[in-house]
A protein has these predicted regions:
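Repeat-blade elements of multi-bladed beta-propeller folds
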Residues: 1-24, 28, 38, 63-88, ...
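Short glycine-rich loop/turn motifs that provide flexible caps or phosphate-binding loops at active sites
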Residues: 16, 124, 148-149
Length: 203
């Protein structure tokens, strides 16, 4: 993590966004890579992990999700929800529900053009991928949004009066990237990213 988390004093939980794995190419680290590209909740009294939600699994796009979600309560289907809202680098706006026991998926909608996710599970929020859009070691792929994400580090803002969310978005920018083999050397970059380019285009 490298952006300060959010704090819910009623629940005694602090919410933090987490980065992507290294090297960048997911084929070098099989599995979901649990807790990467996620929001985690920490008990502020003990420092222990209380719960989590992973926005996307086995990242290969440098879509880290280090921005902490906003603690915004909202209504869905006539129900008031103690919410977490996150504008992801993966180009989706995530609506979650926070409680002492869990972080539950509610909804997710793209806020910029996104061509990697083919479906999001309605119960869990787990996305499915178009694997032709997922770069790997020696495998070039083009994808949207770019490696800069639908939103990079600048924070979002929320107006509680108008109920509007303001997102410093990177729209209409895509990337082409290929991974390369990399050896771990302490103190040096450990990305395994080969040639990449960004373009203001839709693939």
């Amino acid at each position: 993590v490298w952006i300060t988390g959010s704090y819910d004093h009623e629940l005694g939980l602090s919410y933090w966004g987490t980065g992507n794995g290294g090297p960048w190419m997911g084929d070098t680290r099989p599995g979901d890579n649990l807790y990467a590209t996620s929001v985690i909740a920490l008990d502020v009294q003990t420092g222990e992990l209380a719960n989590h939600h992973q926005y996307h699994w086995n990242d290969s796009w440098d879509w880290d999700e280090v921005a902490a979600p906003l603690l915004i309560d909202y209504a869905r289907n006539g129900q008031n929800i103690k919410g977490l809202i996150h504008a992801g680098r993966n180009g989706y706006l995530w609506f979650l529900e926070r409680s002492e026991e869990s972080i539950d998926f509610v909804d997710a909608k793209p806020y910029v053009y996104q061509d990697v996710f083919t479906n999001i599970d309605e119960e869990t929020g787990r996305p499915e991928y178009d694997m032709s859009k997922k770069p790997g070691t020696g495998f070039e792929a083009s994808f949207c949004p770019s490696l800069w994400g639908g939103k990079d580090w600048p924070p979002v803002a929320f107006d509680p009066t108008s109920r509007l969310l303001f997102i410093p978005a990177n729209d209409n920018v895509c990337s082409t990237m290929v991974g390369e083999e990399v050896q771990y050397n302490p103190g040096q970059a450990f990305m395994g990213r080969g040639q990449s380019e960004n373009g203001g285009f839709f693939i």
